[in-house]
């Protein structure tokens, strides 16, 4: 059974190789012109620095190689199948070229300076089905050989160049891909590549211009975009590109709804083939009431993280044309043409309006059906009145019936006659007067002539 090994500071010009169960680097070891190789069967703790021409770290599947010791090497090879490498806590790692083939193992590594993912011996690029997290504190990360991940999580691959820089600081730290070199992901996974400058990286070529898989003004801490990432590979820049905006004036009719935004706003200055990103509000300001408003389109294009050069447009909300309709009631003839009406309108249901009129008249006072009723002097008032206009219309019309008035006639008498063989009767109407007619229901002022016909019950 292999024993545990503690490396207590070995400084040579020759190669160093350590094989044991668990290995602890307790003091700095150096072989600057040759190689250091650590082969373990258990966990490896790197608590002090290692400095070599080529540094190789391996252990058994399921074990962990970790520590705060600074790793300095021209070539850094990780080839432990299934080994988990946690090497992102040291502050002064200085690796020139990194290559890894680790099977199901996870790899987290942060270099203090620029480094390259390349080829070391028989290992080219990085191959893993675990999670991959690479970072440089400052400096570029150059991807010269392919990175292949079969991990299926939302953090399958994270590459972050210039991690010490904040969003909007696009200096010193870009991810640069060699010609034809790619990051290959599982279809269910998400990968994120954080880079600084649009001009000094090659993400558009590798990810694909026009794919919509780019975000801006963001880093691993600050997220200035709101359009969520789905599966696939994304390029996330610290740089904040700026769009110029232009907008046409907008006129809308009052409808009780807030102005949702100016869909005529156009933008120029897109990068990476982006088109029509989600512009927050398009200059919306929740304006509802009639009036004229100056609105500024500004702020960030929240979907992707762009900034916008402000522009102005005028919003005019015109009053809604109020259409007042009337319904008239049927009435019994009363000698006048006065009508009784109810008013209604096309106002917004939740608005407060009071409708009024100064007169409603039938075409004449006489009984009849479907008689025209004219309603004049239309007006309205109320808390919402300023949002409406009659547009010069002051009257409306409808129809209704005037039914005949029932008349009770008294004062008619039958005249006596000599038998003449028939039942014909004659009547005396002299007892019918205006007074008796009015008392019987005639409208005062009307004139009626009463006549009567009839017959005896027998001859």
What function would you assign to each model-found segment?
Residues 1-240:
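Extracellular lectin-like interaction modules
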